[in-house]
Swiss-Prot record:
Signal peptide: none annotated. Its main location: cytoplasm. It comes from Thermotoga maritima (strain ATCC 43589 / DSM 3109 / JCM 10099 / NBRC 100826 / MSB8). Its EC number is 2.4.2.17. It is an enzyme of class 2 (transferase). This is ATP phosphoribosyltransferase. SUPFAM superfamilies: Periplasmic binding protein-like II (SSF53850). Lacks the C-terminal regulatory region which is replaced by HisZ. Pathway: Amino-acid biosynthesis; L-histidine biosynthesis; L-histidine from 5-phospho-alpha-D-ribose 1-diphosphate: step 1/9. HAMAP family: HisG_Short. GO terms for biological process: L-histidine biosynthetic process.
């Protein structure tokens, strides 16, 4: 029995489509659990995917580069799933640039932001937020923000501009290292089927 951690939200539909194309048939489905022959899918928040794998509850999961780097886990990452590419960026009020001295940075990703500031040699005060990070500079809570953007539209709507690109975000297939050892045959077979489906879809799209 393979146990998968599936991120709820924008990735859910794409991941589930790929799973069904590998031949998975779900006999029971709910908002939090989907069960089929020899497979169980836990529907979880994207940030919780690595936690389910690290604690041995799930064997395989799907999550973004942002989550992996924020959580700092040592999961196996065999390949990506094709999705729209987004970026983790440093942004601030248009025309102000990066302030001198201590920088107040609001973000949903404090660990990523801390490492970024250290790499720049900056003295920063990091302000963790759960949502509406773009509001922080407008309200005077922060000088800058570190956040995810795909098109940059939300930043522009809030009179913010990108000051630096920290990294590109992709969707990773991740595997629990213990499961890879103890369920190697099942895990490898599943990954091979999934990769075949992804490659087939990519080839179909490239042919137009």
């Amino acid at each position: 029995m393979l146990k998968l951690a599936i991120p709820k939200g924008r990735l859910e539909e794409k991941v589930m489509t790929y799973l069904k194309k590998t031949g998975v048939i779900f006999e029971r489905e709910s908002s939090i659990l989907r069960e089929g022959k020899d497979i169980v899918c836990f529907m979880v928040r994207p940030f919780d995917v690595p936690t389910y794998l690290v604690h041995g509850v799930a064997d395989i999961g799907f999550c973004g580069t942002d989550v992996l780097l924020e959580k700092e886990t040592s999961l196996i990452q065999p390949f990506f799933i094709p999705t729209n590419i987004s970026r983790m960026v440093l942004a601030g009020p248009k025309g102000r640039g990066i302030p001198e001295g201590e920088k107040r940075i609001a973000t949903k990703f404090p660990n990523v932001t801390q490492r970024y500031c250290e790499s720049k040699g900056w003295h920063c005060r990091i302000i963790p937020l759960k949502g509406s990070v773009e509001l922080a500079p407008i309200a005077g809570l922060s000088d800058l923000i570190v956040d995810i953007t795909e098109t940059g539209r939300t930043l522009k709507e809030n009179n913010l501009e990108i000051l630096d690109e920290i990294f590109v975000i992709r969707t990773h297939v991740v595997v629990n290292p213990v499961s890879y050892r103890t369920k190697r045959e099942e895990v490898v077979s599943f990954l091979e089927k999934l990769q075949e489906v992804i490659e087939h879809d990519s080839n179909e799209q490239s042919r137009g």
